[in-house]
Design a protein with these regions (language model features):
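Accessory "access/gating" subregions that flank catalytic or transport cores
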Residues: 1-53, 61-76, 80-83, 90
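Structural motif
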Residues: 25-27, 57-60, 86-88, 107-110, ...
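Structural signal for hydrophobic packing residues in well-ordered secondary-structure cores
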Residues: 44-51, 85-89, 114, 118, ...
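Flexible, glycine/charged-enriched surface loops at secondary-structure junctions
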Residues: 53-59, 151-161
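Short C-terminal domain-edge/linker segments immediately following a structured domain
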Residues: 57-60, 90-93, 140-145, 163-164
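A glycine-rich phosphate-binding loop feature that marks nucleotide/adenosyl-phosphate handling sites
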Residues: 62-65, 94-104, 157-167
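Thiamine diphosphate
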Residues: 71-140
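Conserved small/polar residues in nucleotide/adenosyl-binding loops
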Residues: 171-172
Length: 173
């Protein structure tokens, strides 16, 4: 970054490591690829009975569509995520192009989104602002959230997803 932008920006990755563990500041599960029913269901199963805590770490989830949002509500998935401290947002493409939940300056954001457009995820390097973005799978994001923001792979935890499979009815249309 210094080679490209000179002294305009400063990246502080060392502040994200405490006691040998890497910490994220923000987590997002969103968009047409991230906010699927299955991803949100698995995230809720991982988060069940746990919390993101009340410190600096935040997490938001954007269902991929209104029918998915409705199904997560009917099957208690949204309820379990909310109880864990996850903020449920409307079905919206914003996080992919930087219009929702952009990371703070020097914030480390873990995201399951479709895209990470250059300079859209909170970064404006020409103005001295840079964010740190790691694209991850929804399950590892939930594992990280359940672990207080410590970067955690979903393969490192045990959980069972007992939610109903996704189905949608168009009889009301």
């Amino acid at each position: 970054a210094k080679k490209r932008f000179g002294d305009k920006i400063s990246i502080d990755l060392e502040s994200k490591v405490k006691d040998g563990k890497a910490f994220a500041d923000q987590a997002i599960i969103a968009g047409c690829s991230g906010g699927t029913y299955d991803n949100l269901s698995e995230a809720a199963a991982i988060m069940k009975g746990k919390t993101i805590g009340n410190d600096y770490f935040t997490m938001s989830a954007y269902p991929q569509s209104t029918p998915v949002y409705l199904a997560t509500t009917r099957n208690h998935i949204a309820e379990e995520l909310l109880e864990a401290g996850v903020v449920i947002k409307p079905a919206f493409c914003g996080p992919c192009f930087g219009a929702g939940d952009v990371p703070a300056n020097n914030g480390l954001s873990i995201r399951h989104t479709t895209r990470n457009f250059p300079n859209r995820e909170g970064s404006k390097p020409g103005q001295g602002q840079i964010s740190l973005v790691c694209l991850m799978d929804a399950r590892s994001i939930a594992a990280t959230a359940a672990n207080g923001g410590v970067i955690t792979a979903a393969t490192d935890i045990q959980y069972e997803d007992t939610h109903k499979p996704y189905s949608v009815s168009y009889t009301h249309l």
